[in-house]
Amino acid sequence: MEAKAIAKYVRMSSMKVRVVLNLVRGKNVNEAFAILKYTPRDAAVVVNKLLKSAVANAENNLDLNRDTLYISEAYACEGPTLKRFQPHAQGRAFRINKRSSHITLIVKERE
């Protein structure tokens, strides 16, 4: 049995989120919470909230025990990019890409 949590349109580059997801993929849920608590990245806050949601889904919807859960899959896909322009000297304009991402966490029970 697996429980899933998805965060869509998170205003953060998927490349930055993947750095944090690589730290917790395959880990026990309690160990992952400890890692995320002391990870000094903005993406850690979003992933922590998403992990809480996935654990709550597992406990409430599937009656799984929190102590036996681990993160089986964790991935971040690119969301839509907001394109903005930054004015520069002599009539020029440079484009700024404000990237977003869709983050998915799947927790399973260890056999």
From Swiss-Prot:
This is Large ribosomal subunit protein uL22. The keyword Lyase does not apply. InterPro entries: Ribosomal_uL22, Ribosomal_uL22_bac/chlpt-type, Ribosomal_uL22_bac/org-type, Ribosomal_uL22_CS, Ribosomal_uL22_sf. The lineage of its organism: Bacteria, Bacillati, Bacillota, Clostridia, Eubacteriales. It comes from Clostridium kluyveri (strain ATCC 8527 / DSM 555 / NBRC 12016 / NCIMB 10680 / K1). One of its GO terms (cellular component) is cytosolic large ribosomal subunit. SUPFAM superfamilies: Ribosomal protein L22. PANTHER family: CHLOROPLAST 50S RIBOSOMAL PROTEIN L22-RELATED (PTHR13501), LARGE RIBOSOMAL SUBUNIT PROTEIN UL22M (PTHR13501:SF8). One of its GO terms (biological process) is translation. HAMAP family: Ribosomal_uL22_B. Keywords: Ribonucleoprotein, Ribosomal protein, RNA-binding, rRNA-binding. CDD domains: Ribosomal_L22.
